[in-house]
Curated annotation (Swiss-Prot):
InterPro entries: Herpes_Orf11 (IPR006882)
Sequence similarity: Belongs to the epstein-barr virus LF1 family.
Pfam families: Herpes_ORF11
Record protein name field: Uncharacterized LF1 protein
Record's miscellaneous remark: LF1 is absent in strain B95-8.
Region (Disordered): 203-244
């Protein structure tokens, strides 16, 4: 079954492990060992193959919709090495990174699998650069008194620009030079029952002490098509506490944890800025989002000091995608300095920041995002407390300029020893084969049984009719 207008180059099938891709025609490759090959479909379109009469849209299945999509090797090939990659731009065309000395790949030499990893819990941050100031208009906020160096702020946010939400609250304490950790939770309610949701009140219910760093906190997003977190019973209880009769499906929450306070720029982390008005004795909190809308409530907890062992490890420069305890953690990788990569060459660069609070048993690796066609980030294994080094290959024909503002990929670590038997939900990168594994046994690839029987068939469309999201 071919997708989009290229009906002969690729074939996709539903298998027990996910969506299987394979090349149907020979693929001619240019000079060089590393290659980025474009698939003629996005992850969203691949999961909506029902528009061609196969099954109902897989994207509507909660196990798929709330998962992390990964593109990995479906079958080994001795002459082609396929690097695993994760997909965070579900509407962008997918790319696969391969290493081979062949100049032509025969049909079915390239076998890929779009895996939906749904066992891990993801807390999604706002990965945007902060802007100066908090905007002209801010909603009235309420702040609890600072105790033990902690400050909790909650209230209703108002759009201060097309891409920012703002909140103003009174605070007469000392400047927040010592606030190091922060937890930000944005919640809103949709549909029936919104009148009983805390989004209608100025004071959002304050969760119990320690709730902000609990592993039971699970998140969603305010916009369709963005990466969503797995929502379990714990997440529903946490998100709906104190909300009356609001149904769990009517509420959505965005939870953001991280570290670091830049006193020079008044910045907690990318996407969050605070400014102080000495004349009015108030503080403005400004949060950047993709699209600012009314109806959002925030609950912010600022704390001093480094993270505890219970809270896991964090990257000091960028909170990234953070999970706690037995789950795994993702960090976006930015070069520490500016660099230029010549065409068809690779260089070694150091990533910004370093892990804090980790144990020597932590292992991880760096990997490529699937929606990039400009460079290849070779997977590298590293341990906690060691600098994160990256090997960047320029697969283009022009010099590649990278710097601190360039997100090259992501780093992943898991709190487990490298062994042949990992707990369910763990992700493992096998150093010898360069393959990504998930589940109890690392000897087999990740698995996902797609509930085909529960899906509703859609009318069959012609291949010439474009996909519509």
């Amino acid at each position: 079954m071919a997708l989009q207008t290229d009906t002969h180059a690729w074939r996709v099938e539903i298998g027990t492990r996910g969506l299987m891709f394979s090349n149907c025609v020979p693929l001619h490759l240019p000079e060089g060992q590393y290659h980025k090959l474009r698939l003629p479909v996005s992850a969203y379109e691949a999961l909506a193959v029902a528009r061609y009469g196969l099954v109902g849209s897989l994207w509507e299945v909660p196990a798929v919709n709330s998962a992390l999509q990964c593109l990995a090797a479906a079958a080994p090939c001795k002459d082609v090495k396929i690097y695993p990659s994760c997909i965070f731009q579900v509407h962008a065309p997918m790319f696969v990174t391969i290493k081979t000395s062949l100049r032509c790949l025969n049909p079915h030499d390239l076998c890929l699998c779009l895996i939906c990893v749904g066992a891990a819990i993801l807390d999604i941050p706002l990965l945007c650069a902060p802007r100066d100031g908090a905007g002209a208009r801010a909603a009235e906020g309420q702040a609890a008194a600072a105790q033990g160096g902690k400050l909790r702020v909650w209230g209703r946010l108002s759009p201060s620009s097309p891409i920012s939400l703002s909140l103003a609250f009174p605070y007469a304490g000392p400047p927040p030079v010592a606030w190091y950790r922060h937890s930000i939770k944005l919640t809103r309610s949709e549909g029936v029952g919104i009148g009983k949701d805390c989004a209608q009140d100025h004071a959002c219910p304050v969760p119990p002490q320690g709730h902000a760093s609990s592993a039971a906190d699970q998140a969603g997003v305010p916009e369709r098509g963005r990466k969503r977190a797995h929502e379990g019973p714990g997440a529903g209880e946490a998100a709906s506490a104190g909300r009356g009769d609001v149904a769990l499906s009517q509420s959505r929450a965005l939870l953001w944890r991280g570290l670091g306070w830049d006193t020079g720029r008044g910045r907690l982390a990318p996407g969050l800025a605070m400014s102080r008005d000495a004349a009015s004795g108030s503080v403005h909190l400004d949060i950047q989002v993709d699209r600012a809308e009314e109806g959002w409530v925030c609950d912010v907890l600022l704390e001093p000091g480094p993270p505890t062992a219970r809270e896991g490890c964090f990257l000091s420069m960028d909170p990234g995608l953070v999970t706690l305890k037995d789950a795994w953690t993702l960090f976006p990788l930015h070069p520490e300095h500016d660099a230029v990569v010549p065409p068809k060459e690779e260089i070694h660069v150091m990533a910004q920041g370093h892990l804090q609070g980790g144990t020597p048993s932590l292992w991880g690796f760096t990997f490529q995002e699937a929606a990039c066609d400009q460079w290849v980030l070779r997977p590298r294994v590293w341990t906690a407390h060691s600098p994160i080094k990256m090997t960047v290959y320029n697969c283009g024909h022009k010099p590649l300029h990278i710097g601190p503002s360039t997100r090259l990929g992501l780093a992943l670590f898991w709190p487990a020893e490298r062994s042949d038997n990992l707990d369910a939900g763990r992700i493992f990168y096998q150093l010898t084969s360069g393959e990504l594994y998930w589940g109890r046994t690392v000897a087999r690839p990740p698995t996902l049984t797609l509930p085909v029987d529960e899906l509703r068939p859609w009318p069959k469309l012609t291949p010439e009719e474009p996909m519509q999201h």
